[in-house]
Amino acid sequence: MNAPHPASAALTQTLAARPTLAELEARDAFAERHIGPSPDEQAAMLATLGYASRAALIDAVIPPAIRRQDGMPLGEFTQPLTEEAALAKLRGIAGQNRVVRSLIGQGYYGTHTPGVILRNILENPAWYTAYTPYQPEISQGRLEAMLNFQQMVMDLTAMDIANASMLDEATAAAEAMTLLQRVGKHPSNVFFVADDVLPQTLDVVRTRAEPIGVQVVTGPAADAAKHNAFGVLLQYPGTGGALLGGLSTYQALTDAVHAAGGLVVAAADLLALTLLAAPGEWGADVVIGNTQRFGVPFGFGGPHAGYMAVRDAFKRSMPGRLVGVTVDAQGNPAYRLALQTREQHIRREKATSNICTAQVLLGVMASMYAVYHGPQGLKRIAQRVHRLTATLAAGLRQIGYTLEAGAFFDTLTVATGPRTANLHIAAQAHGFNLRQIDDGRLGVSLDETVTRAEVVALWEIFAHAAHAGAPDFDQVEAGIADAFPASLARQSAYLTHPVFNAHHSEHEMLRYLRSLADKDLALDRTMIPLGSCTMKLNATAEMLPVTWPEFANIHPFAPADQTVGYREMIDQLEQMLCAATGYAAVSLQPNAGSQGEYAGLLIIHAYHASRGESHRDVCLIPSSAHGTNPASAQMAGMKVVVVACDERGNVDLADLEKKAAEHSANLAAIMITYPSTHGVFEEGVKRVCEIVHSHGGQVYVDGANMNAMVGTAAPGHFGGDVSHLNLHKTFCIPHGGGGPGVGPVAVGAHLAPFLPGRAASGEDASQNIGAVSAAPFGSASILPISWMYIAMMGAAGLTAATEAAILSANYVARRLSPYYPVLYTGAHGLVAHECILDIRPLQKESGISNEDIAKRLMDFGFHAPTMSFPVPGTLMIEPTESEPKVELDRFIDAMIAIRGEVDQVISGAFDREDNPLKHAPHTAQVVMADDWSHRYTREQAAYPVASLRTRKYWPPVGRADNVYGDRNLFCACVPMSEYAQD
């Protein structure tokens, strides 16, 4: 037998050594891009912890009793798709949607998003990956943008103070109702809603009113003062377009309500307010609404930034975030979140609201729309919309149709009689969605995107149905006058601050946006190790579909045959989330985690009521819980009973047994977070569920920490009945600097009939809890982000991400434990996906606080960890799975260097008051000033580690003075003179 030729043998060896095609294709896996540490880096991290494999670590961290063994089947998405394949699949699904010109109105309007805003805000990770600006010194850019939003709302509504966005108009109305009940002196429990208020707003108000004993009464706006109500809600203009009359009509109406002891909420269209007298000018006490038409697409209902503005007397009762102006350590103006002591994470069940995340990114877009167009530009847009609407109205009258309102802004209600259904169909056939109000009326709402040709096309549709001819556009338009009383025309100035009058060219706008982004720290610059926040990668491929027209340009009340793709994507995402949680059903309607919590508790309440046990109203909440838990329980009409935690941070089972037995007859639920808020997997979680179930209660598992469980444990399997998820944490929707968020509620099969629904859509609402958000699917246009993430990761990738998150947290904890005590650990001295460093012993010895360390981290180019939650005087760190080892090590090295500085304070090498920690952060202005009086060097201040010489972030302001800011509350744009240098 002949020996093989040497060349042939070499070829065989070469072929055997080369990777297979399958191996080459596997290297394009998205999971490898999403998970930061490489396999080799993970091995090194595991070696630091003393574990041979990731599986061995997970076995030691997660209690065996709750480990899932099914591999988390995801159906067709069990195997991951590449980025390209996932985008192609989703593009095919989106293609089933049909983009039609929607003139439905009902609070949602077509709008042109200026390209400079689309590209440099909505599509810019410097804006969308930032967190809520709790650390003001590294958030000055978005704080300024949020202050612009507040100024815009205050000016247009003529109110004293506005907050930095609400979740949507409907929840803003519900919050306004409870605000009026808190601040008013009226003994009544009646809240009057005018019958021309948006239907979805009425739905949400009714949902919010029922558990707190408020009676909602509806009727004509003119009857508002006749019902002995503590509060009245008016729509301005009404849903059907009507204005009630002149300025005196509105003033007389509010005067009558005030004389009866009530207060008035106006739901106002901001674009209309550029032409119409502002609600603050005719006596409204609170003004709410939506800013969607200021450059934010329909998005099938969201996300959009709602707003609320109030009279000065009510500012401390206003929900949501509030940006104020203070001074920094050098006396320069600085922005910060003001009046934080009224928020849920501090006030708990006594908070003004449970709202946490709002809609900052969308609020920034809306404010920049106003900055870009300025007051004159906005007025021109409004005048054009009104002129076209008045022209359309005159033409319809010529054709022979009757309009219900003589005074209007942009919406017409047309009496169409028996032609209604056919007209509705004909309009759709010609590319227009109209609002069918009932069997005899159609609504038409115009917006800035509507053209002259489309007005003519509408005339032709209506004329054909009436067997008449369409009028001539130029002839009709030539005779048009304003379609509202002259006395209602706005006389007051608005948007007079220079910021709204200086950035109207694209170059100016582009550079302004860049200057703001440069002031901030977001994930595009550095890791954000905030505990309980899961600041993970928001991959570009996940973000791309958000602005596709097939997702962006769909009205939330478009006909079902135009939203087939949306429904398919939503159905698939719901199934994915059911698989991840172990529950039977999911609703994606809640547009924030706080709303998901609230919905979950309402579901529990409805379930008990369906069994004749509506008296069950006690909610057990561990003392370590996030503040939204007790705030949500209070909103749901439940009584909060606190359960103690033991010295290891776990629920005290003995105290739980005692409290559950004590309240057995009235026990509705327990709210627990898992892994716990203390960052550990409690061994006794199944026992907690058993105890509560044995006393007839339901188990609410807060899903804020789901990033530690996906693929490894499922709340629906270990005893949970209901959970909310934070898609803006676990499933990669970005935080947007404080919103948007999505807070789906997931339930067991026995609770599925009670998931949120809405009467406005005609759905059977006999069992569901009603609507908790304005749109049927909440913030629908950002749901593709989570769909993409899950589709690209697959079951194994999602599980690997969870394991990597746990590995990274334990790596950080282990490396920092010689320098800072890790407050809580579980079995084997390990943590879950986050760890809490106890700074209190160091503070006692050195005088250096957790705030000093947080501010000093800014000099190192890092966002601080979570401060003083859930334990005062601590720092909670959550690195997530997405940070590479080099970034983890950079953060660890910074923390070790800071500990070295603390030691120098203790030893006396640094003065206890004049040291780099007490004066952090250090601005470039301070470091480069001629005068340097500190007892440490400029280099120690600015470059505490050598790596900063090639990667230096300069905080734009020094430490913000919180006390000054709250004592001298100022929540409007700062006069430019304040920035003048002496």
UniProtKB/Swiss-Prot annotation:
Keywords: Oxidoreductase, Pyridoxal phosphate. GO terms for biological process: glycine decarboxylation via glycine cleavage system. It catalyses: N(6)-[(R)-lipoyl]-L-lysyl-[glycine-cleavage complex H protein] + glycine + H(+) = N(6)-[(R)-S(8)-aminomethyldihydrolipoyl]-L-lysyl-[glycine-cleavage complex H protein] + CO2. The modification N6-(pyridoxal phosphate)lysine is found at K729. Its cofactor is pyridoxal 5'-phosphate. It holds the Pfam family GcvP2_C. Its EC number is 1.4.4.2. InterPro entries: GcvP, GDC-P_C, GDC-P_N, GDC_P, PyrdxlP-dep_Trfase, PyrdxlP-dep_Trfase_major, PyrdxlP-dep_Trfase_small. GO terms for cellular component: cytosol; glycine cleavage complex. The glycine cleavage system is composed of four proteins: P, T, L and H. Belongs to the GcvP family. This is Glycine dehydrogenase (decarboxylating). It comes from Ralstonia nicotianae (strain ATCC BAA-1114 / GMI1000) (Ralstonia solanacearum). The gene is gcvP.
